[in-house]
Design a protein with these regions (language model features):
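Positively charged, polar, low-complexity stretches
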Residues: 1-79
Length: 79
């Protein structure tokens, strides 16, 4: 599960997503690349721990990540 406390920057957020979701080495570390990777292989469900911490660090980018996950059909739970 992604840990929002580790997402202190956009780069750190994409590192965390890559680690947790097992994204490929060519993952471009942005919202479009995340959407592309989720088309090929997506988890059924993700629990995003400490979403509030990510939101404080990332602002609207945290909501953007959540939107991409949900648009890809991932059942997202924020905690």
């Amino acid at each position: 599960m992604p840990d929002g406390a580790r997402m202190i920057s956009r780069d750190a957020a994409h590192d965390e997503l890559s680690r947790v979701l097992g994204l490929p080495a060519f993952y471009g570390r942005n919202l479009d690349a995340l959407a592309d990777c989720l088309r090929d292989a997506r988890p059924d469900a993700v629990t995003w721990r400490d979403f509030d911490a990510a939101e404080r660090s990332l602002g609207d980018h945290a909501a953007g990540i959540a939107r991409v996950l949900r648009d890809a059909g991932v059942a997202l739970t924020v905690a």
